[in-house]
Amino acid sequence: MPAGSRAGSRLRSGSLPRPSRLTLKALRPAYAPRTPDSNGDLDTGSELGPGSPAPTAEEVEKEMAGPSQLCIRRWTTKHVAVWLKDEGFFEYVDILCNKHRLDGITLLTLTEYDLRSPPLEIKVLGDIKRLMLSVRKLQKIHTDVLEEMGYNSDSPMSPMTPFLSALQSADWLCNGEPTHSCDGPIPDLSSDQYQYMNGKNKHSARRLDPEYWKTILSCVYVFIVFGFTSFIMVIVHERVPDMQTYPPLPDIFLDSVPRIPWAFSMTEVCGVILCYIWILVLLLHKHRSILLRRLCSLMGTVFLLRCFTMFVTSLSVPGQHLQCTGKIYGSVWEKLRRAFAIWSGFGMTLTGVHTCGDYMFSGHTVVLTMLNFFVTEYTPRSWNFLHTLSWVLNLFGIFFILAAHEHYSIDVFIAFYITTRLFLYYHTLANTRAYHQSRRARIWFPMFSFFECNVNGTVPNEYCWPFSKPAIMKRLIG
């Protein structure tokens, strides 16, 4: 279909907003400078040449309603006044047309910033938004005029502000996914996007750099912390209070629930299942390097805090079934050998590791809760079964710790609280880009600033096969 017939069909169907009002018939052959008339309004008649009378408002109205069209370049202040009245902005005709002499070209380049800032300083937010919507309709119709003047959608000075581009291309995320379609395909988040910082537009690109060297550094960090924790556990075992002198402290849960001998083993079984689920999610996730880095940094930080709480205060054993006595390791090498045994056995009774005195706070609760939160955060929200299973394993694991009388209730509560708060604080900072360049964030959270400086925004839940296809599979499926 020819371009003219297509444009005519669009005009007849009404798909364009008031086209006969926005492009008008040519009123005069040439442009001449405008001068104020005796009433203070602009004398648009000067454009007709010397001695030509200025058109009245009724004449301009008639011309605008006519079948012919006038290029917006030839719009005068009276045309803009008629357009403003037609759009319902009567109260702004005087300030825009008479006082500030807004013609067609200047109307086309009007921005929301112009309306908010001096000399206009319009105070009514609704009027600002409605006026800008009307102006953007004009800009959309007259994009050829804007491009001729050097304004285009790629230009940083374009009146078609980056805000519109951000609304059209931004991906609003929930749990790492678009909110409008959590079950649909994940859009490409590597494209440039816009954001507001301190009231101004800032152009930034979504970055999700894997930075494997930082991931390796975070793994080294967490392994060093685990080794240090094992050594502290050896020291606190030497300082465990005598059971005859310091009996178990009163505890509401432990006093009310009888001990289940096999419960602590079930806690570690729950932890192993959660660990396998997390390893599977980690392998299949597209941004596995970022996920592993975050897990190691968070786990290392929580266990480093646990080292201090264990060391500064030694609580009495929580039950008479625990045959814990202060065990003295003679030399430093013996302590290191015992610490290596705890470290290599992951501190689990399933691997034959038995410790005493490491009560404030529960390391098993930390691991269970951290794995649960990572599984639920980095899997799609629609995977309800997996999320329910993860929470069931977490809560049952905590219950089994208390049912086995291996920890006081306060140990479990503090561990759960610290782990969840640290996880949520970390991800809130990571998902809020304004904190990435914050001096306060760099001072208070130096490790966070180091690990997350090149992760710009929420990590989307995208999955891919981590291994290369075998040669025979490539030949079969391409």
Swiss-Prot record:
Its main location: endoplasmic reticulum. It is a multi-pass membrane protein. Signal peptide: none annotated. Pfam families: PAP2_C, SAM_1. It catalyses: an N-acylsphing-4-enine + a 1,2-diacyl-sn-glycero-3-phosphoethanolamine = an N-acylsphing-4-enine 1-phosphoethanolamine + a 1,2-diacyl-sn-glycerol; an N-acylsphinganine + a 1,2-diacyl-sn-glycero-3-phosphoethanolamine = an N-acylsphinganine-1-phosphoethanolamine + a 1,2-diacyl-sn-glycerol; an N-acyl-(4R)-4-hydroxysphinganine + a 1,2-diacyl-sn-glycero-3-phosphoethanolamine = an N-acyl-(4R)-4-hydroxysphinganine-1-phosphoethanolamine + a 1,2-diacyl-sn-glycerol; N-hexadecanoylsphinganine + a 1,2-diacyl-sn-glycero-3-phosphoethanolamine = N-hexadecanoyl-sphinganine-1-phosphoethanolamine + a 1,2-diacyl-sn-glycerol. Its EC number is 2.7.8.-. It is found in: Endoplasmic reticulum membrane. Pathway: Sphingolipid metabolism. Residues 1-22 have a biased composition (Low complexity). Expressed ubiquitously with highest levels in macrophages and testis. The keyword DNA damage does not apply. Synthesizes sphingolipids through transfer of a phosphatidyl head group from a glycerophospholipid on to the primary hydroxyl of a ceramide in the lumen of the endoplasmic reticulum. Belongs to the sphingomyelin synthase family. This is Sphingomyelin synthase-related protein 1. It comes from Mus musculus. The lineage of its organism: Eukaryota, Metazoa, Chordata, Craniata, Vertebrata.
